[in-house]
């Protein structure tokens, strides 16, 4: 029992002796460090270092860490931490020393300058003993709960942050080199803004700020350089280069016109990025960097593909035609993606142990770190400004978005579009290869073998062909949405199998095994095609941002269900182009605010919220919610329909004791809805059908009046004259005389091929005169006309936009309205011009916000002069003679744009806004959408995308 105790006592003595020995050795090391600072470093024998280490390693715990990117090694010595620990009476420390050794990195680098630390007593033995581990004694000073850098004095609370800072010091020394001048503290100069930095970590953070601004899209592969290579210019390199002429920092302005599509851009960068869309990015196999003696040796891996996320724009020196410095033109391999495994083995196997291969691995890790950091900085910069008024601009087409998520979806659409363009440019496989594939199946047919040997595996069909098949399937679905269930049916599969069998000369393969379920295949590629069409619609709407758009939100009912259809209109050339942006199932509980929020969310995916927008809604949607976002007009067909319904409703007629009118309407409905009448007996009243929001009761009354003779002949042969005898022909004629102009006005206002907004005010004036003239008659017709006048003033509201649009018609101008309203309408035109003139100004958007208050007083006379010129332009236009023939309005304003600039811009915006929100195709679209909803064939999101493709692709 005494043996363990006796053994423990000598062990304690040994530990105390070892502690005293380690303390004495630590004091000798400190004295030797002080002496080396004065006398210089002296070599220490290896034996002495080994003996000293054996004394100090008695009670030392060693921790090892392995970083992800194999950074250079750092040994942590907690000297400051040990000083705060409790010390026993005999001078020994209670807690042993703790050393953290980071293993890994390049073997040829031990310290920041490639040498042993100056204060290290080990000298050259450190390099020999650790063989690839460098000791940085003064890098860490742990005091008061923080990590302090021994080089620059910065303090960090967390170890990871401090490790990143030490890594930046490593990069600093690696970049500056051994021969760099230590006297020059500010060694890193930014060639973009000229700022200088002492430490590489600070310069790296500053360099990331320029990363978002210099990224753009270039069409040619040789223009894709590393943006960070353009930002890093060493001081010695700047001194050796000749001075360059001063160039203004900022975007280049001018008038740039695309030679492919004719779009114009004021700034060179959006124009350059737009031209790149016509020539998609592709990696040419024969591309090589320019032959430059200074840079040819640095580009050692031409097969590494450049990262598509970071493509640098041309520098100003390259644009001016001068030779760029060597630091700018060198091969940009830091941001290139790591090549595939096969390529990596190809050029790394011969020199697997060479420093070049290890440097390539370090550069690839550094590229991933820098690329991720720049991307995170880009996302944080955009996400931090969500509440600001600054828009998010697409670098490819220049379109602005209010929300950052919409910009990301738009950029993905560009990526999908470019990918498909690249795939379409690739050459197809030769026919000989296809014939070889079918040869085994030809033997099968001739020998009557089994079909198992001739089946083609799923991988034999290229992805491009599968995309083409999916596109055709989606086109079939868009042509008739009722074919969703037919596509997966047996008959359709048999038809597809027959087509494949007939097209193959030497056999066939199973369509079901190769393509699988057709619905699944089509819906798999639905988001890709949706993004392709969406980016085209976004570009089309964004190109007309300076003119404004018109947006209609109209509900269409089919039985008990209804849905909202959102459509955007704009002038493209001499025509009005419409785009269906979204379809949403309507609910009785949906208020005007809910519909307004849905409209704004959909519009934010295509256009900016600041764009000038005129909304056209139906009677179910409250105009107060939309008035906050822009001008809100009511559908003219819905307004006239409300006028007719309010007068001819049974409650109103009963209150006015007009029982004969009620009886007449009931008889007309019975005659028009009789099953014994053939279709040819009741033909259509007009070749152009009215919009779907028109009243059906009025149509039945007008139909009976027009086909009265045919109806009487039909019922006389059928010996059913009781219905004809109960029909009041005189009252029918008077009602037809009132309702026919109303329906004719609705048909004119619903014209889809010509502008219609300028016809609203003349229609109101014409109907008002008609009802006033008929009101002087006696009897029931007079009462009805008084009711029509009251309903017209209450339901058919005339907006100032209607008055301005009427003036913009050179055939009408102010002729339809009385003279006492001329000055009021001219004032409305001038007000509307003043409201939108700020967006027409070319330099207003780029004036700093701080300068606007100081220049407000100076711009007052200029604004007054501008108002006077705008008013004179309106009067000059009104003094011109009226057109006798009906002109093409867009063609007319295209010809007089130089003469009447402000009015022309106003005309291209307002005349594209329709007067009627509902269209003839809305009924069919709503029926198909509701059919999909009832049968649950698709999810609401997929249904919306499919309706979008149906409207904008076919």
From Swiss-Prot:
A zinc finger (C2H2-type) spans 147-169, 188-210, 256-278, 392-414. Residues 366-380 have a biased composition (Basic and acidic residues). GO terms for cellular component: chromatin; nucleus; pericentric heterochromatin. Residues 1-19 have a biased composition (Low complexity). Its main location: nucleus. Residues 340-357, 442-459 have a biased composition (Polar residues). Keywords: Acetylation, Chromosome, DNA-binding, Isopeptide bond, Metal-binding, Nucleus, Repeat, Transcription, Transcription regulation, Ubl conjugation, Zinc, Zinc-finger. Residues 1-56, 282-307, 337-390, 421-463 are annotated as: Disordered. There is a cross-link at residues 63, 81, 239, 437 (Glycyl lysine isopeptide (Lys-Gly) (interchain with G-Cter in SUMO2)). The modification N-acetylmethionine is found at residue 1. It is found in: Nucleus; Chromosome. Regulates UHRF2 function as a specific 5-hydroxymethylcytosine (5hmC) reader by regulating its chromatin localization. Interacts with UHRF2. Belongs to the krueppel C2H2-type zinc-finger protein family. This is Zinc finger protein 618. It comes from Homo sapiens (Human).
